[in-house]
């Protein structure tokens, strides 16, 4: 009905309003090209009018929805209509177009549009948003390396509304990819931007584990000292840092410096670090020639019910060694045999070690 009226009454005072309504109708029917043509006729027929202004807004929205912001500005210039063609306006509309595509779920097209925005406006007002959306496109497309690159770029920018989410995702991706130095950097930065003590504790743990995974003892010792000084590092990070420090000291022949750390950790044998620490204290005590004290420590360790059977078994092997050192072959053999008969799994070296001790007793 509207289209017929428009075609038959080009000089009617209602021509322009009808044409504008027709443009809106086409838009609602999902025919943006026909809608744009109607709006352009409105601008041409009644330049400078309120109706033309509204039509120009419609034209702009159609171009933006199509991701063709440059097309809109080219039309406006050609039509001779007034509009804001400043860099700021172009920046805003270009991002709006890219964002609209991103929100539509068209990941592949959104990626291209967002990259175009970032390329054309390297210092754009929406750089943070564009980088965040782009990283999400990469994640949805399972493009891990590209996601890491984009997230790293966003993480390097001043703190913004995306910082915590960006660093959380970046730390996880780099850690899973074995990129330990990058993961450590992301986790450490994450500690400084998250809001709760639990979140900071998790970040501190991730930070220390990533540094330690890098295999550099000097870096691990430095990270351990840093973690132990962080107010919200949490018990897990603190414990793992202390244990790593003790282990590095022991490996470096500094047993006297490592022992106090092992003693402190051995108070809680429910953890893997605590269980091994208890054994290391036993080992050091036995190595120092005090078999009686070592025996007492072994029984105390066993009574605590540690779930870490490996280190409990190692302690019992040490107990068998104490008996053997006293020439009590019967007790020594019984201790070793109890491990052979009752320990599992059978392939981690413990059973083989106990059997070797039994064979040694036969000689």
Predicted features by range, described:
Residues 1-363:
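Acidic, polar-rich low-complexity tracts and alpha-helical solenoid repeat scaffolds
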């Amino acid at each position: 009905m509207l289209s017929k009226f428009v075609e038959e009454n080009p000089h009617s005072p209602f021509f322009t309003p009808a044409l504008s309504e027709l443009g809106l109708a086409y838009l609602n029917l999902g025919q943006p090209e026909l809608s744009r043509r109607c709006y352009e006729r409105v601008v041409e027929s009644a330049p400078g009018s309120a109706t033309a202004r509204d039509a120009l807004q419609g034209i702009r929205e159609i171009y933006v929805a199509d991701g063709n912001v440059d097309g809109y500005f080219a039309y406006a210039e050609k039509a001779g209509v007034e509009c804001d063609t400043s860099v700021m306006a172009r920046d805003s509309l270009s991002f709006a177009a890219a964002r609209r595509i991103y929100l539509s779920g068209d990941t592949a097209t959104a990626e291209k549009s967002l990259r175009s925005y970032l390329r054309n406006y390297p210092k754009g007002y929406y750089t943070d948003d564009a980088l965040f959306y782009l990283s999400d496109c990469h994640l949805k497309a399972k493009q891990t390396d590209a996601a890491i690159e984009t997230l790293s770029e966003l993480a390097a920018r001043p703190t913004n509304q995306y910082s915590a989410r960006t660093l959380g995702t970046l730390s996880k991706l780099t850690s899973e990819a074995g990129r330990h130095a990058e993961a450590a950097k992301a986790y450490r930065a994450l500690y400084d931007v998250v809001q709760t003590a639990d979140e900071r504790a998790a970040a501190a743990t991730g930070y220390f584990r990533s540094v330690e995974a890098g295999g550099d003892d000097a870096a691990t010792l430095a990270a351990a000292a840093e973690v132990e000084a962080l107010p919200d590092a949490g018990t897990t990070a603190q414990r793992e840092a202390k244990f790593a420090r003790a282990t590095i000291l022991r490996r470096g022949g500094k047993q006297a410096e490592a022992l106090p750390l092992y003693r402190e950790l051995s108070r809680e044998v429910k953890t893997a670090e605590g269980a091994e620490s208890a054994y290391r204290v036993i080992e050091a005590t036995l190595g120092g020639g005090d078999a009686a004290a070592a025996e007492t420590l072994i029984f105390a360790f066993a009574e605590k019910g540690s779930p870490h059977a490996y280190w409990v078994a190692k302690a019992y092997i040490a107990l068998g060694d104490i008996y053997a050192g006293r020439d009590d072959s019967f007790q020594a053999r019984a201790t070793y045999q109890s491990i052979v008969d009752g320990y599992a799994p059978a392939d981690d070296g413990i059973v083989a070690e106990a059997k070797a001790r039994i064979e040694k007793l036969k000689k």
